[in-house]
Swiss-Prot record:
This protein's encoding gene: argD
Miscellaneous notes: May also have succinyldiaminopimelate aminotransferase activity, thus carrying out the corresponding step in lysine biosynthesis.
Domain of life of the source: Bacteria
Similarity comment text for this entry: Belongs to the class-III pyridoxal-phosphate-dependent aminotransferase family. ArgD subfamily.
Isoglutamyl lysine isopeptide (Lys-Gln) (interchain with Q-Cter in protein Pup), cross-linked positions: 304
The protein's name in its UniProt record: Acetylornithine aminotransferase
A Pfam family: Aminotran_3
Free-text remark on how the cofactor is bound: Binds 1 pyridoxal phosphate per subunit.
Length: 390
């Protein structure tokens, strides 16, 4: 039996049957069950910042697991405290950290923090994606994902993303928080207009509302800054993160700035696995490697190489490329992203249809220039095949 047939027999069908079974990886390359190699331009959906089998992550995890594996949230451990200190240092202002296991969990605790302000109204963005648990789903501005699970937690309104006037009209003195992604990831790699996050900071400050930035996909250096909001020079009240933080291990974090970090008091929230010493050791290894190899700045440079290279092809199926750093979206002239994903896979490249007309690229930050050039060189034939099949 193949892995796919075994999957169909025992796994729930929320994902459908995977088109591929992967068995190993090295750097930015993965290998399937038939021994075929693929250039991983998706990175486990923006997770594998250091690629596969990175020695720093392997050493950190192995050493920690051989020392102390799990303690629960009842006890302090060195890796958890050290990673929290490092994240606060990256944020550049006084803050407190809550560790969990995923991005949606990080957004759930952020949601709870907003309720502790004494206000309940939340403003989020149309098309946004904040996760699939009930609170995060209420924040998500995609009705098709919400409808099967309604009623959801209430008093959340959605406004057009990037529209300062709409945001200003929606936020008032009864607003607890505004939730935004610095760049929409699942929504199609949508970059807001210049000045949007600055305006959001000004609007929320004016009305005493929290500005919560979901950096689950954009954080940990992917966009060419450790946090994507740092491109705009602002300081939010709450930042959520996950994905790349653990180098492939499950970890999420919610950072709350200043007095906002004091709102959670004993008994109000918890996570048995959150801050697990093995996962936080992996996170420390990721941060140390980013610094040692200057991978954050490198992501900014390689992102331009990738986006400019694709646009310079002048292919009729490509309208434009948008994004920052190594989070890029190829915007197509027709809604054939799924066909491009399939054609790319057949050609040995893993990409993702984030929207009907957008192909998402989120490769490991250790990807080489040669690997990027190989993808750009192969892309015209991939697009031609997709055009024929769609």
């Amino acid at each position: 039996m193949t892995l796919q047939s075994r999957w169909e027999a025992v796994m729930m069908n929320n994902y459908g049957t995977p088109p591929l079974s992967l068995v190993s990886g090295e750097g930015a390359v993965v290998t399937d069950a038939d021994g075929r190699e693929y250039l991983d331009l998706l990175g486990g959906i923006a997770v594998n910042l250091l690629g596969h089998r990175h020695p720093a992550v392997i050493e950190a995890v192995t050493t920690q697991l051989d020392t102390l594996g799990h303690t629960s949230n009842l006890y302090a451990t060195e890796p958890g405290i050290a990673l929290a200190e490092a994240l606060v240092g990256q944020l550049g202002t006084q803050a407190r950290v809550f560790f969990c296991n995923s991005g949606t969990e990080a957004n759930e605790v952020a949601f709870k923090i907003t309720r502790l302000t004494g206000k309940t109204k939340i403003v989020a963005a149309e098309g946004a994606f904040h996760g699939r648990t009930m609170g995060s789903l209420a924040l998500t501005g995609q009705p098709s994902k919400q409808a099967p699970f309604e009623p959801l937690p209430g008093n959340v309104m959605h406004v057009p993303y990037g529209d300062v006037a709409a945001l200003e009209a929606a936020v008032d003195d009864q607003t607890a928080a505004v939730f935004l992604e610095p760049i929409m990831g699942e929504g199609g790699v949508v970059v807001p207009p210049a000045g949007y996050l600055v305006a959001a900071r000004e609007i929320t400050s004016k009305h005493g509302a929290l500005l919560v930035l979901d950096e689950v996909q954009t954080g940990v250096g992917r966009t060419g800054a450790f946090f994507a909001h740092q491109h705009d020079g602002i300081v939010p009240d709450v930042v959520t993160m996950a994905k790349g933080l653990g180098g492939g291990l499950p970890i999420g974090a919610c950072l709350a700035v200043g007095a906002t970090g004091d709102l959670l008091t004993p008994g109000l929230h918890g996570s048995t696995f959150g801050g697990n010493p093995v996962c936080t050791a992996a996170g420390l290894a990721v941060l140390k490697t980013l610094a040692a190899e200057d991978l954050v700045a490198r992501a900014g440079v390689l992102g331009k190489t990738l986006s400019h290279g694709i646009e310079e092809l002048g292919h009729p199926l490509v309208d434009k490329v948008r994004g920052k750093g190594l989070l890029q979206g190829i915007v197509l002239t027709v809604p054939s992203a799924k066909a491009v994903e399939t054609a790319a896979r057949d050609a040995g490249f893993l990409v993702n249809a984030a929207a009907p007309e957008v192909v998402r690229l989120a490769p490991p930050l250790i990807i080489t220039e040669g690997q990027i050039e190989a993808f750009i060189t192969a892309l015209p034939a991939v697009l031609d095949t997709a055009a024929e099949d769609s």
